[in-house]
Swiss-Prot record:
Species assigned in the record: Listeria monocytogenes serotype 4b (strain CLIP80459)
Protein name: Putative membrane protein insertion efficiency factor
Major location (coarse): membrane
Start-end of Basic and acidic residues biased regions: 69-82
Family stated for the protein in its record: Belongs to the UPF0161 family.
Positions of the UniProt region annotated as Disordered: 66-88
Keyword flag Phosphoprotein: no
Amino acid sequence: MKKILIGGIRLYQKYISRFTPATCRFYPTCSAYGIEAIQTHGALKGSYLAIRRISKCHPFHKGGLDFVPPKKEKNADSEHSCKAHHHH
């Protein structure tokens, strides 16, 4: 699914975006953000982040730097310690 979504964005970049004036208010561009979000967070959350970003790309938003948030790693130690302190 990730490959299909990223492929769609790349088609947009190659066949649509390059022939239109640059209008993205952010860096990285919304399409580059979408690709990175999907690569980092997977198809579902990455698509959500990309759609949320695109919804902010309009003349009434100041734009600017807006990077994909890092993926939160599950902390096995904290889960383990929670179980150790749980009383039955």
